[in-house]
Amino acid sequence: MKKAAIWKNLIICLVIVIVLAVFMDPQSPVSMEALDKELLIKGNSGYTIRIIYAEIQHSELRESLDYGVIVSGENERREKSGTWRNEEFGEYRICVDAKVDYCIVLYTESEIQVVNIESNESTASLYEAILKLADDTE
């Protein structure tokens, strides 16, 4: 095989790998860990939101939310985490997978937290579990 053909094939393979890397949907950047009295929502960036069930005063499942602007934290293609500000809440804490529309808004005495996990369905299930756990701690 000629050198030009080898280089051509190499470039084609490289382009295919790059396209796959860009368009493949990797695992969600947000994970959760459920403990007895709290829930941890963790971003790949290392940012963690600690939700203590007994401190939840009110919660809502939203099908969409205007996240606003970042104050500090991450604003990546898939992960939004840290402290953000929008017109509705002012400053609040967030840890979400940006490709998931649904999110859970949690109100405590001291702050507002916005979280979601890998899919709309998983986020809705998590919301139902949080409602039950928050009721059980009252």
What are these regions (language model features)?
Residues 42-53, 57-109:
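Non-transmembrane, membrane-adjacent beta-strand/coil modules in membrane-associated proteins
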Residues 2-3, 8, 37, 42, ...:
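Context-gated lysine
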Residues 4, 44-46, 119, 123:
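Short, structured coil/loop segments at alpha-helix boundaries
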Residues 1-31:
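Alpha-helical transmembrane spans
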Residues 21-52, 58:
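Conserved beta-hairpin
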Residues 5, 13-14, 35, 102, ...:
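N-terminal recruitment modules of adaptor/scaffold proteins
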